[in-house]
Design a protein with these regions (language model features):
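C-terminal edge strands of extracellular/lumenal beta-sandwich accessory domains
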Residues: 5-14, 70-72, 80, 84, ...
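Extracytoplasmic/lumenal soluble domains of exported proteins with redox or metal-associated functions
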Residues: 32-36, 103-109, 147
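Extracellular beta-rich ligand/substrate-recognition surface
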Residues: 16-34, 96-101
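Structured alpha/beta or helical-core interaction and ligand-binding surfaces enriched in interleaved
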Residues: 10-26, 42, 53, 110
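Beta-sandwich interaction modules
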Residues: 78-84, 88-116
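Acidic, Ser/Thr/Pro-rich low-complexity intrinsically disordered segments
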Residues: 28-94
């Protein structure tokens, strides 16, 4: 009788997001800052979609290149790579982007047929400036955002899950 009163579980597609939003901040104009980070994303058989979002803002990049040079693009850059399982350092990345000037927000979408099961590595290496000058108009901060979002089926149990919460189907199989 009590079982009949229980609401049915609801299957939803839920996004799981990985990545970074970073703003460079240094004390002087002559110091660049290095930033690197990486994270592992588990692709199991339930992942149905991958969306990568990337944007870089490198203010005054063309003017500074003329002033101090950046022929090899080593002074200010954002380099992002997504590696499939077991391919890092022995093959080309699944996806990559490199910005040495402003890079408008771009979304890259991949479907299930593009995926190999296992642990994927999202890696970023960047170098930039972040200057707060006494005069606001002379201040600038390099900035980038990169996110990889996977979509997986998730079950919401109304009796135990709060709104927006659910359990990934792949976690129920373990």
């Amino acid at each position: 009788m009590i079982e009949d009163m229980r609401e049915e579980p609801v299957l939803i597609e839920k996004e799981d997001r990985f990545g970074w939003d970073y703003t460079f901040d240094s004390s002087t104009a002559v110091n660049t800052i290095m930033y690197s980070n990486e994270t592992t994303i588990l692709f199991d058989e339930t992942v149905s979609k991958l969306v990568i979002e990337f944007r870089a803002q490198l203010p005054y990049s063309t003017y500074l290149e003329d002033l101090i040079g950046n022929e090899t693009n080593e002074v200010r850059y954002v380099d992002v790579k997504l590696w499939q399982p077991g391919t890092r350092d022995i093959s080309s990345p699944f996806w990559e982007a490199r910005a040495t000037q402003d890079y408008p927000l771009e979304r890259f979408t991949f479907g299930k047929s593009d995926f190999i099961l296992g642990e994927w590595d999202l890696v970023v290496e960047a170098r930039g400036y972040g200057i707060t000058a006494p005069v606001d108009q002379l201040s600038f901060h390099d900035h980038f955002e990169v996110y990889a979002t996977i979509t997986k089926p998730c079950i919401r149990f109304p009796e135990i899950d709060d709104v927006g919460e659910c359990t990934f189907v792949s976690d129920l199989k373990s």
